Amino acid sequence: MTGHVEARAALLLLADGRLPAGGHAHSGGVEAAVLDGSITGLRDLAEFLRGRLATSGLLAASFAAAVCRSVRTAGPATELAADVLAVFEAEVDARTPSPAQRAASRAQGRTLMRVARAAWAVPAHPAAPHHCVALGIVAAAAGLEPRDAALAAAHASVNGPATAAVRLLGLDPLAVTGVLAEIAAEVDRIAAAADTASALRAPERLPAGSAPQLDLLAERHRTAEVRMFTS
Amino acid sequence: MHLEHDRPLGGGGAPAASGGAGPRWQSPPGTPAGPAPTDRALRVGVGGPVGSGKTALVAALCRALAGRIRLGVVTNDIYTTEDADFLRSAGVLDPGRIRAVETGCCPHTAIRDDITANLDAVEDLESDLGRLDLILVESGGDNLTATFSYGLVDRQIFVIDVAGGDKVPRKGGPGVAGSDLLVVNKTDLAPLVGADLAVMARDAAAMRGGRADRPVLFTSLRSDAGASDVADWVLAQLPSPARPQ
């Protein structure tokens, strides 16, 4: 009697900041930026988030969408083709020059895969893929579309760092929500661009947005004497 | 491995109110702790407010147990790796047996709401070191409501100290009321801060429903560097094949 109902609730679950997927311990460079004085308040934070979204956000969203598309095309496999995933992993590695960022991405990929295995039919391997690769795998397992995976990745690229800024600077959380709402349309745009790219391009030609300042912040953070966030 | 315990803190049920003094979070009647695991290390959480002596207690337990059972420690610092560094420098345990988890300003989140990074850490300890008997998971200093998820640990110890005042047990909360073992630390300071240990013992027992399976121990690590009563309790939690003779 019922027609096809598009999966929406699963997307909300996947993008929920309270999803126990390990993200709460990562600031995405915000802690290092607070320490070096480049984020001191709401305006700085908004600019930081816009820059992050346009670079590493686009990259993550493109790979999440591409992996989701690849898994969906391959059918409801319980074990993903290792060679296909290895290509995506290598491409993300090549786009992530900071070892600290690669480690943070894989740590979050591992924790996301853990919670996803409790929620959906997600295979045991890969155990610790890049976070954006994990998002693509999980989105497909949750019955979501590539554009949903892209949106979740783009959202995560700003939402977690914004929360970290609230904790680190004592910013007004309501005002920070206002900032996130301001850039929500950009999140949608980035997700749409990522989805389109994932449909048209091979893995090696997916967006390679780069933010040298984020790389430097990540590297500096790993050697900081005092550190509250993992990244 | 996620423990998938279906065991609420304090054994389930709604918070109860005590007469007269307003509502308190008391221990409801419930089920005893589940059986100790036999296919991996027993995981024991050590939580409690800032400064109550969690790290010192973990160091004491290492001192007492490291030579007797296969032991690992995971720390959850508020920031950086202060507690892990302290344990390493105290020389009570091989540094390779200590892992630090960073908690993003939210120690309670890492032990209760999002335990994934801690699960990674406890699993990594056993995959790197081989089979262990016991892993102590020390929380970052938080407050009276910060307790462990039973998806992460099998047992939890909540540590308070007399210097916070003898009213602390009366305040209750999930840690005081529902932990498997309540430790009241720094008893040597009681005369200096005017804390009445008998009052603390009475209030703690009341908050914990007077249950024999949920004991309260009083410790002074200054006079007992191996926290022998706590160490004995921990050993008694191990499955019998893992218990040293």
UniProtKB/Swiss-Prot annotation, chain B:
Subcellular location per the Swiss-Prot or TrEMBL entry: Cytoplasm
Chief site of localization: cytoplasm
One CC-aspect GO term: cytoplasm
Gene3D superfamilies: P-loop containing nucleotide triphosphate hydrolases (3.40.50.300)
Listed name of the protein: Urease accessory protein UreG
Top-level lineage group: Bacteria
Composition-biased stretches (Gly residues): 9-22
Positions contributing to GTP binding: 48-55
Region spans: Disordered: 1-43
A GO biological-process term: urea catabolic process
Molecular-function annotations in GO: GTP binding; GTPase activity; nickel cation binding
Record family assignment: Belongs to the SIMIBI class G3E GTPase family. UreG subfamily.
Function comment: Facilitates the functional incorporation of the urease nickel metallocenter. This process requires GTP hydrolysis, probably effectuated by UreG.
Nucleotide-binding is among the record's keywords: yes
Sorted UniProt keywords: Chaperone, Cytoplasm, GTP-binding, Nickel insertion, Nucleotide-binding
Pfam families: cobW
Subunit structure: Homodimer. UreD, UreF and UreG form a complex that acts as a GTP-hydrolysis-dependent molecular chaperone, activating the urease apoprotein by helping to assemble the nickel containing metallocenter of UreC. The UreE protein probably delivers the nickel.
